[in-house]
């Protein structure tokens, strides 16, 4: 029979010399296999962190040019695993993890491999959208402004 006392696993040793005695097993261990959706597995995390740094440096200029809020839902196996927001409408711009704090003008639902190909310039965004590789809701034409932001970031 298992009992948990003081956050350490203990087992009742019924066949020991003294009935009712507890044997300490030691502290619990971390699972041998990491969580399947750990942040280190995603290539988009460092990309968005770098984009965030870029927005901090030139955000006020981008706000004047773009004037929109973009939410990007990054998916894996059809499930959203990350949400990022690029706010180029308010203040001097901001990029943060999570859903848009204010209503997003455009929401992209995009698989991570497709996003990485778009960011690296290996795939044309218009052709990918028309081929159904990702979904866009809201003001679809603002996607062209986001494409320019990504190209500007790539040169940075």
From Swiss-Prot:
Signal sequence, start to end: none
GO CC annotation terms, alphabetical: cytosol
Organism: Bos taurus
Ranges for domain SCP2: 44-156
Name of the molecule in the record: SCP2 sterol-binding domain-containing protein 1
Superkingdom: Eukaryota
Transmembrane stretches, start-end: none
Gene: SCP2D1
Pfam families associated with the record: SCP2
């Amino acid at each position: 029979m298992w009992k948990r006392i003081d956050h350490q696993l203990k087992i009742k040793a019924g066949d020991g010399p003294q009935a009712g005695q507890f044997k300490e097993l030691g502290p619990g261990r971390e699972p041998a296999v990491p969580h399947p959706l750990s942040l280190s597995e995603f290539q988009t995390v460092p990309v968005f962190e770098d984009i965030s740094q870029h927005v901090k440096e030139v955000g006020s200029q981008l706000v004047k040019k773009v004037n929109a809020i973009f939410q990007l839902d990054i998916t894996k196996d059809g499930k959203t695993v990350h949400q990022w927001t690029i706010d180029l409408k308010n203040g001097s711009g901001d990029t943060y993890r999570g859903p848009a704090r204010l209503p997003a003008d455009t929401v992209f639902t995009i698989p991570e491999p497709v996003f990485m190909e778009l960011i690296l310039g290996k795939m044309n965004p218009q052709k990918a959208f028309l081929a159904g590789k990702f979904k866009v809701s809201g003001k679809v034409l603002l996607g062209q402004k986001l494409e320019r932001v990504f190209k500007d970031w790539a040169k940075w």
